[in-house]
Amino acid sequence: MNKPVLVSFLVSGDPNPDATLKFMKTLDKYSGVIELGIPFSDPVADGPTIQAADVRALSNGFKIAKSFEVLKEFRKESDTPVILMTYYNPVFKRGIENFVISAKEAGAKGLIIVDLPLQEATEYREICKKHEMGTVFLAAPNTPEERLKISDEASTEFLYLISTFGITGARDTFEQMTFDFIKRARTTCKGKICVGFGISKGSHAESLIEQGADGVIVGSAFVDIIKNYGDSEEALVKLEEFAKELSEGIDKGYEKRNK
């Protein structure tokens, strides 16, 4: 991840596993990383869009093993890094080590466990290190300096900067607070920093990259397309068009940053 990248988020199994695989292949063209969300019945950090996608996947009989199968299939054609996003409950129920091994065997590059605080993640981090599984932790605009440093050190792939307070979901604009947070993280952190929550336009990606982000994480806006177009050729066209717009925004932001 040298040049800034698009991190594209999809909910695994929405609306079905075969569609997820097609969506991943479509987004792969413009994505430096793909984040694959494992549906969960109580996704507290996610807004209505991703919650609804989780419900769609779960109501169609989704099982965690399906995420691993989809990833294995994707791996046959692409070496783009895939980060699995989940909540702690499914990992705990399966057993942390079993989950990490399954994810590794499927071809995952790293894991995000949204609701696992860093101070409670010692065992998880040790297991990930043992199996060479990457870790991604989150930081918010009010994260103190020292915790930001520790979170950065604990994140082997990138640190996930939450652009604003609250839940995921598309927004129209970003506040100065977000840009200040990126600059602060850029100064404090040694590793990569990617910004997520609320990115829904190429211009958003442009401004966030210009401020110093190494990547933008886009989820709800992609999931909205899937909600509207389902498992269809039109969905693939719309996903690709939007990914292209975001990618172009990233490139523009990077050019501005380097002027």
Swiss-Prot record:
The keyword Lyase applies. Belongs to the TrpA family. One of its GO terms (molecular function) is tryptophan synthase activity. Tetramer of two alpha and two beta chains. Pfam families: Trp_syntA. Gene3D superfamilies: Aldolase class I. The keyword Amino-acid biosynthesis applies. Pathway: Amino-acid biosynthesis; L-tryptophan biosynthesis; L-tryptophan from chorismate: step 5/5. Keywords: Amino-acid biosynthesis, Aromatic amino acid biosynthesis, Lyase, Tryptophan biosynthesis. PROSITE patterns: TRP_SYNTHASE_ALPHA. The alpha subunit is responsible for the aldol cleavage of indoleglycerol phosphate to indole and glyceraldehyde 3-phosphate. The gene is trpA. This is Tryptophan synthase alpha chain. GO terms for cellular component: cytosol.
